[in-house]
Amino acid sequence: MSQWKDICKIDDILPETGVCALLGDEQVAIFRPYHSDQVFAISNIDPFFESSVLSRGLIAEHQGELWVASPLKKQRFRLSDGLCMEDEQFSVKHYEARVKDGVVQLRG
């Protein structure tokens, strides 16, 4: 079973933003959508352009679904599972994320 890996302190991520981190050799976009300890993690790679940009995308909520819009062409990816809301064949990898004792952790 995979271990939880410490990534950063929750206070290192401003509310309503995302950051990029390395988990092994994979770039992961970690999002903190609210002023709370809730975090989400998906691949940082935009599958439409194979660019490392999703962590800089715009976080929004629609009909109870949190998503991030790619800064390139604005395709939306659900934070809960990485599903591309415009075209499911371009979904991105989702990572288990949590905050424990003020530290953001990813399962890897």
UniProtKB/Swiss-Prot annotation:
Catalytic activity: NH4(+) + 3 NAD(+) + 2 H2O = nitrite + 3 NADH + 5 H(+)
Location within or outside the cell: Cytoplasm
Enzyme Commission code: 1.7.1.15
Protein keywords: Cytoplasm, NAD, Nitrate assimilation, Oxidoreductase
Gene Ontology CC entries for this record: cytoplasm; nitrite reductase complex [NAD(P)H]
Keyword Phosphoprotein assigned: no
Superkingdom of the organism of origin: Bacteria
Entry annotated with the keyword Ion transport: no
PROSITE patterns: NIRD
Gene Ontology molecular functions: 2 iron, 2 sulfur cluster binding; nitrite reductase NADH activity
Protein's job: Required for activity of the reductase.
Family: To B.subtilis NasE.
NCBIfam families named in the record: nirD_assim_sml, PRK09511.1
Protein name, per record: Nitrite reductase (NADH) small subunit
UniProt organism field: Escherichia coli (strain K12)
Origin organism lineage: Bacteria, Pseudomonadati, Pseudomonadota, Gammaproteobacteria, Enterobacterales
Gene field: nirD
